[in-house]
UniProtKB/Swiss-Prot annotation:
Annotated effect of mutating residue 20 to F: Low CIII activity
Native source species: Escherichia phage HK022
Keyword flag Cell membrane: no
Stated family: Belongs to the lambda phage CIII protein family.
Alphabetically ordered keywords of this record: Activator, Transcription, Transcription regulation
Lineage: Viruses, Duplodnaviria, Heunggongvirae, Uroviricota, Caudoviricetes
Biological role: Presence of the CIII protein in the cell results in the stabilization of the CII transcriptional activator (a very unstable protein), CII activates CI, the gene for repressor, and thus promotes the establishment of lysogeny.
Effect the entry attributes to changing residue 21 to K: Low CIII activity
Entries under PROSITE patterns matching the protein: LAMBDA_PHAGE_CIII
Coiled coil: none
Name under which the protein is recorded: Regulatory protein CIII
Length: 44
């Protein structure tokens, strides 16, 4: 079952490379936003 999931994700990234790139950027943005929020909370 795990092998099928891994192969499926590999096929998805092969067909939609820009999609994985986009999701990675979104995750980076979310991480940056969380850091900024934490910094603001620490400043108070």
């Amino acid at each position: 079952m795990m092998h099928f999931q891994l192969a499926g994700s590999g096929v998805m990234s092969a067909f939609y490379p820009h999609e994985s790139e986009l999701s990675r950027r979104v995750k980076q943005l979310i991480r940056a936003a969380k850091k900024q929020l934490e910094a603001l909370c620490a400043m108070k």
